[in-house]
From Swiss-Prot:
This is Putative lipase atg15. It catalyses: a triacylglycerol + H2O = a diacylglycerol + a fatty acid + H(+). Lipase which is essential for lysis of subvacuolar cytoplasm to vacuole targeted bodies and intravacuolar autophagic bodies. Involved in the lysis of intravacuolar multivesicular body (MVB) vesicles. The intravacuolar membrane disintegration by atg15 is critical to life span extension. One of its GO terms (biological process) is piecemeal microautophagy of the nucleus. It holds the Pfam family Lipase_3. Residues 42-603 are lumenal. It comes from the Eukaryota. The lineage of its organism: Eukaryota, Fungi, Dikarya, Ascomycota, Pezizomycotina. Belongs to the AB hydrolase superfamily. Lipase family. It comes from Emericella nidulans (strain FGSC A4 / ATCC 38163 / CBS 112.46 / NRRL 194 / M139) (Aspergillus nidulans). Keywords: Autophagy, Endosome, Glycoprotein, Hydrolase, Lipid degradation, Lipid metabolism, Membrane, Signal-anchor, Transmembrane, Transmembrane helix. Its EC number is 3.1.1.3. GO terms for molecular function: phospholipase activity; triacylglycerol lipase activity. SUPFAM superfamilies: alpha/beta-Hydrolases.
Length: 603
């Protein structure tokens, strides 16, 4: 009887222990569930503005569907306002207007809260393992110092397979095209821009929204994937040859062989790096491209600040025309998926900026790289996309644009509208809204994407590198001049056919050697514009030789001079002159001065 009771008591104690454990878990689990808090990035003390609340996102699969909505508009100054960096957070009560490609504002409020649907698929990208901005800046600084991209070991690179835009899905491509077409500004009087850097107040400045690079930031429902759509702030592609815009300056700086020099007089020159015809200082060009007020530097800063808001999100990039080229350069720098539309060929600036390049590739030919994750959509009737908008009669030239680059990195997805639709090459087909309505929506299928093969930029040019930041060229020239002098007697006693045959004194010419060393700080089209010359002249006198001609001939002196015989002058008088010439007098003989021989008489 006692044994069953003892066993029952033991099991009762065990049940009590299990119950106690379950009660403890029940008390802990609610606290774990309620521990979810919105994550704040960057402290209030570190920045002058209140950061937005960005909740943590769950990991998602590489393939799926995303619904993106506009979350922020970021303005990064470049030319006139290099310190400007402002952000507009989109709220339910935000009022926006649409800006057309011609720069005309729509008076009606824009509808921007409609979600953009896109799908993702796995994409493999070869990129740096350490992609922190500070590390990237070190690589770029080393490239500027060395004159080319630094060589990194294979251990510093990795091939990652991540979620990227589905470039085989027409709806996804349309979504990205519409994102690049959107350009919004706040309704006047409702502005709510925040200064990110907290240094300057541009609320009373005029025109700051027309300076620099603008990014529209879209995020999906979980904030796990964001899309940065980059665009230049000059809405109209061509605003006349007499108007200077930031886009024109950056276009000619990044996509010209030498900053708009060496071509049409209509091109706007944005640096002075040309030495002579088809010869330029590459160091000078690279320094101009890396100025802090240029679009590439602005894109790095813009990307860095956006990723601080979404540190764990997957970032996709897109853009149209110049914005597409900047998105591609940014994607090559950080190893991000990129989808562009009618982008300017960007392999030339990618090589000059010294972007990190994986082992086995030539840094001077980034168009040969594989696994970049970049896809460039465009059609054959667009001269900007095809790299042919640089002829004498092209609209680009007449607009002041020197767009000489022809090669894209990554893969090109080309609609052959010239062959399929009979289109003529024209700049009007470059507009993104025309591309959406007349190309992407009209074609049933997307084009096949393939890398560009055997493409080279600026083949006629020769580039050299200079030491240091100052543009200096030094040349040394040696000039030899000969001066011939001759001394003649004052009276010519023996005239000849081609001059006097009298005694003459001839002096061998002295030889003068002049060495000129010039330093040129500003090379011009056909030479140096500000030479400072130092001339050293050395003159060597030759010995003087005197010769006497005694027996002159037709072409010079033949032998020593023989004694001369002087004759007395003959005298004649004419008493009966002729009518026209001659004398009718009887000739008067003149005795010879030489004594005649004696007459011999025979005895």
């Amino acid at each position: 009887m006692d044994q069953p009771h003892r066993r029952t008591r033991k099991w009762h104690l065990m049940d009590l222990s299990v119950s106690t454990l379950l009660m403890s878990l029940a008390l802990v689990l609610p606290s774990c569930v309620s521990a979810y808090q919105p994550v704040y990035f960057r402290s209030q003390e570190a920045t002058p503005f209140i950061p937005p609340q960005v909740p943590s996102a769950d990991p998602q699969s590489l393939s799926g569907t995303h619904e993106f909505t506009l979350r922020h508009i970021v303005q990064r100054g470049a030319y006139e306002y290099p310190e400007l960096h402002r952000r507009l957070d989109i709220k339910p009560n935000t009022q926006l207007r649409t800006v057309s490609e011609d720069g005309i504002e729509d008076n009606e409020p824009a509808v921007f809260n409609v979600p953009f649907v896109a799908s993702s698929e796995p994409v493999t990208i070869e990129r740096l393992a350490d992609r922190r901005l500070s590390v990237i800046e070190e690589h770029l600084a080393a490239a500027r110092s060395a004159g080319s991209a630094v060589t990194l070991s294979s251990s510093q690179w990795t091939k990652d397979t991540l979620a990227g835009p589905n470039v085989t899905d027409k709806k996804t491509i349309l979504t990205f095209a519409k994102m690049t077409a959107n350009d919004y500004i706040e309704v006047p009087g409702t502005e709510d821009w925040q200064d990110i850097n907290g240094k300057l107040n541009y609320s009373t400045s005029f025109g700051w929204q027309n300076d620099g690079l603008r990014g529209h930031i879209y995020a999906d429902d979980t904030n796990s994937t964001i899309v940065i759509s980059l665009k230049g702030t000059s809405p109209a592609l061509f605003d006349g040859a007499g108007t200077t815009t930031n886009d024109k300056v950056n276009d000619n700086l990044y996509f010209s062989c030498c900053c708009g020099q060496g071509g049409s007089y209509l091109w706007r020159e944005v640096c002075d790096c040309q030495k002579s015809a088809f010869n330029a200082n590459l160091t000078c060009i690279i320094e101009a491209m890396n100025d802090e007020n240029r679009y590439y530097r602005a894109s790095l800063d813009l990307y860095s600040n956006v990723t601080e808001l979404y540190p764990n999100a997957n970032v996709w990039l897109t853009g149209h025309s110049l914005g597409g080229a900047m998105a591609s350069l940014l994607g090559l720098t950080f190893g991000l998926p990129v989808v562009t539309f009618e982008a300017v060929p960007e392999a030339l600036p990618a090589a000059r900026l010294g972007l990190p390049t994986p082992p086995g590739y030539n840094p001077a030919l980034p168009q040969a790289r594989k696994f970049t994750g970049a896809y460039h959509f465009g059609h054959t009737a667009d001269p900007v996309y095809m790299g042919t908008c640089n002829g004498v009669s092209s609209v680009c030239t007449w607009g002041g644009y020197a767009m000489e680059s022809a090669c894209h990195t990554g893969q090109m997805c080309v609609y052959d509208t010239v062959a399929d639709k009979g289109w003529r090459v024209a700049i009007g087909t470059h507009r993104i809204k025309a591309v959406i309505s007349d190309v992407i929506e009209v074609y049933d299928d997307l084009p096949q994407c393939a890398p560009e093969e055997e493409c080279y930029d600026c083949e006629l040019w020769k580039f050299f590198r200079s030491n240091g930041s100052e543009i200096t060229t030094t040349s040394s020239t040696t000039t030899t001049s000969t001066i011939t002098t001759s001394t003649r007697t004052t009276t010519c006693k023996t005239p000849g056919w081609w001059g006097c045959l009298d005694d003459s004194t001839t002096t061998d010419p002295p030889t003068t050697t002049t060495t000129t060393s010039s330093t040129c700080k500003t090379p011009g089209w056909f030479g140096c514009k500000d030479p400072t010359s130092t001339t050293a002249t050395t003159t060597t006198e030759a010995p003087t030789t005197t010769t006497t001609c005694k027996d002159p001939g037709w072409f010079g002196c033949r032998d020593p001079t023989s004694p001369t015989t002087s004759t007395a002058p003959q005298t004649s008088t004419c008493e009966t002159p002729g009518f026209f010439w001659g004398c009718y007098d009887t000739q008067t003989a003149v005795d010879h001065l030489i004594t005649p021989a004696p007459i011999l008489i025979d005895l």
